[in-house]
Amino acid sequence: MTLREYILFWQETYDKHQSRPTTYAAHNYVFKNHILPSLGDIPLSELTSEMVGDFLEGRRRFGNHRPGSSGLGEETMRHIHRLLQQCLDQAIRDGLLTENPAKAFRYRKSTTVKANIMTPLEMEDYLDAAERLGYLPMFMLALTTGLRQGELIALKWSDLDIENRTLTIAENRAVVRRELVEYGSQTRTIALTPEVIDLLIREHDKHPSSPLMFMHPATLKPYSPQMVRRMHDEIIKEAGIDHIRYVDLRHTCAILALKNGVDTKELAQMLGHYRPTITRQNYEPYLPHKVQKDEDIPNEATQSELICSLHERQ
């Protein structure tokens, strides 16, 4: 049995039934585009730690399998490594291997996220550009709440409580092939500012019959993550801040919250982190030992109120 044959077996037998649909799709992408082209034809019983190490080092240096191409980022490398280990661990339980050849490779783990924190001027330019392009409600919501892309595109109007100014995030809802899929009931609730509520009410008036908060105007289906990235790329190009990634909206929201006195437990709940220690590890290195209030930031402002105050609209 080759590694390719076992991976296909593992996907159908285990991964498809144990992972979320979006996670399963992401795993399939990694296997197809990274692991199988290099290691797929090797007999499973002949796979060695040296082969795995050479493969991972090659992906680190040449991400697209050929010299001259740019290497893979640290997060992608760790994801590939973990996935291969997970698959081979099951091969041991299935009695096909006695040890995991992927475990000998040690890839340095980063202790913090790599974040480009937006300045007040960059936030204002970003929101100005989003408004000119017609994308303001979606990206104002993203910047003021730190929502992940997948959470943003899966929102429904029934998640919004206008009276209490809150939004309930269905953490087990996802967009798969442009359709909403729900596979659990875990939720978290976050507060919204009056400015964001007003924007969302006006957005609802544009398509009141749709259950989706944000949808593609031509297909009336949810946006895909790729579409959100393209819209974000349009915004940063229009604003002239090309170094800002979508994930930096989330990082900016988190850092501003901490600077304004939100504790890590509360921030972890808002961001959907499993443990506050993850939040602390990710973001506290970006702050002074004793957090001082930025002179540009009103002391009484929450992270959402701060960002909204930068760009008041009628």
Model features per residue range: what roles?
Residues 8-21, 32-114, 128-129, 203, ...:
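N-terminal core-binding DNA-recognition domain of tyrosine recombinases/integrases
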Residues 47, 79, 225, 242-260, ...:
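Short basic/aromatic active-site micro-motif
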Residues 70-74, 78-80, 93, 97-99, ...:
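Basic, Lys/Arg- and aromatic-enriched nucleic-acid-binding interface segment
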Residues 93, 140, 144-151, 227, ...:
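C-terminal catalytic core of tyrosine-transesterase DNA break-rejoin enzymes
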Residues 159-166, 262-282, 307-310:
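Short, polar N-cap/turn motifs at the start of nucleic acid-interacting alpha helices
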Residues 164, 175-198, 202, 218-219, ...:
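C-terminal secondary-structure termini that scaffold catalytic or DNA-interacting sites
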Residues 172, 193-241:
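Active-site/catalytic core of tyrosine-dependent DNA strand-transfer enzymes
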Residues 173, 271-296:
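Catalytic-site neighborhood detector that most strongly recognizes the C-terminal catalytic loop/helix
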